Structure formats: C-alpha cells, structure tokens
Swiss-Prot record:
Cofactor note: Binds 2 magnesium ions per subunit. The magnesium ions are essentially bound to the substrate and have few direct interactions with the protein.
Gene, per the UniProt record: HPRT1
Crosslinked residue numbers (Glycyl lysine isopeptide (Lys-Gly) (interchain with G-Cter in SUMO1)): K115
Broad enzyme group: transferase
Species of the source: Meriones unguiculatus (Mongolian jird)
Lineage of the organism: Eukaryota, Metazoa, Chordata, Craniata, Vertebrata
Name used for this protein in its record: Hypoxanthine-guanine phosphoribosyltransferase
Length: 218
C-alpha cells in the first residue's frame, strides 16, 4: 500500500520573516504581518513533490486536475518540475490537464458550502489516473466533496497534492497524498492564495494582518 509523503511542519510558534527582508508590492505593505514561506522555499519543496509524484504515479498517463483559482501557481510550477523530470530521466509519463473551480470561502472562513462554479467536463477522468492539485487543505470538507464528485466518473486512481495543510480544530481529518507544508491555524495569502480575490499577486506565502482583513472584507 502506498504511503503518504512527509511534509515540512511549521510550528505554531514560527515567527516568520520581516516584510522588509523581501520584495513586497507597496500596495500590500500595510496589509501583511509577515512573510511565512518565502518563494524560494516553495519552489524547492515543489521540486521534491514532483519527484514524489513521479515515483508514486510514474508509468501511467496522468490527468492533472487543477483546483482554481488558488491552485494555479502551485499547479503550474509542479507540472513544470514534472516535465523537467520527463525530459531528464529515463522514467517519463504522459500528462494532460483539466481544471475545476470551487468556491467555499467568504472572508477568512471556510463556509462548508462547496460550490462548483466552473471547469471542464469531468467525464474525461473516467478510467484515468488523476492527480488533483490544490493550494490549501483547511477543514478538508472541500476536498472530500471534490473527491466524491470525481469518483462518480470512475477514475482508475486518484491522488491529491496540496501545497499547504492547515492544523485546525475544524479539520475533518482528511490528509492529502502529497503535502508541501503543514502550517498553523493562520489565514495565509500569496502565491495565488487570496483573501476575497486580493493578494494572489504575491510571490511569497504571507500572513494577512487584521487591518488587511478589514480593508478587503467582502
């Protein structure tokens, strides 16, 4: 039986990094507490996850399913590393891509009401090996709902890669197959993670400030 890959665990008392140490867009300078995961660390970790995916799923055609919008940066970078491995190693796998868009957040809370509001026809997943790529697992309810939806199309295999998993008492206990970082129960933005559609244009994963939440509240 396949085992889930390990992750980098960021402790509850992790201080993060001062904003002044990084290039932060000026329009967000007053809206963030700190840089939590620098972009370079994200990229290095993503490269390793690509190797883990190849080891676990290599040899079979993969349909990579991107969960929009927050997952698009991680999705693009992960697939770039997989493509590099395809070019430079003896083991390669053909890949195709699909997209699905879900909505479960209002302000900084996961509503638990999961809506599929866009995406391709998922009948293309039938009989395929599917890699779902997500930005963050919070309560886990969204992913459980998506997995139930995907299973209706009878894929051959389903694996989930998430850049982040949040430690939270609200969790239903779901854990993805591939995890970049396990983080404390803080609301993070950047690297395509948003707060009411803002902050997707940050390179780093950052902790939003209370003033930032108030400024961009829906």
């Amino acid at each position: 039986m396949a085992t889930r890959s390990p992750s980098i665990v960021i402790g509850d008392d992790e201080p993060g990094y001062d904003l002044d140490l990084f290039c932060i867009p000026k329009h967000y300078a007053e809206d963030l507490e700190k840089v939590f995961i620098p972009h370079g660390l994200i990229m290095d970790r993503t490269e390793r996850l690509a190797r883990d995916v190849m080891k676990e799923m290599g040899g079979h055609h993969i349909v990579a399913l991107c969960v929009l919008k927050g997952g698009y940066k991680f999705f693009a970078d992960l697939l770039d590393y997989i493509k590099s491995l395809n070019r430079n190693t003896d083991r390669s796998i053909p890949m195709t891509v699909d997209f699905i868009r879900l909505k479960s957040y209002c302000n900084d809370q996961s509503t638990g009401d999961i809506k599929v509001i866009g995406g391709d026809d998922l009948s293309a997943l039938t009989g395929k090996n599917v890699l779902i790529v997500e930005d963050i697992i919070d309560t886990g309810k969204t992913m459980q709902t998506l997995l139930s939806l995907v299973q209706k199309y009878s894929p051959k295999m389903v694996k989930v890669a998430s850049l982040l998993v949040k430690r939270t008492p609200r969790s239903v206990g779901y854990r993805p197959d591939f995890v970049g970082f396990e983080i404390p129960d803080k609301f993070v933005v950047g690297y395509a993670l948003d707060y009411n559609e803002y902050f997707r244009d940050l390179n780093h994963v950052c902790v939003i400030s209370e003033s930032g939440k108030a400024k961009y509240k829906a």
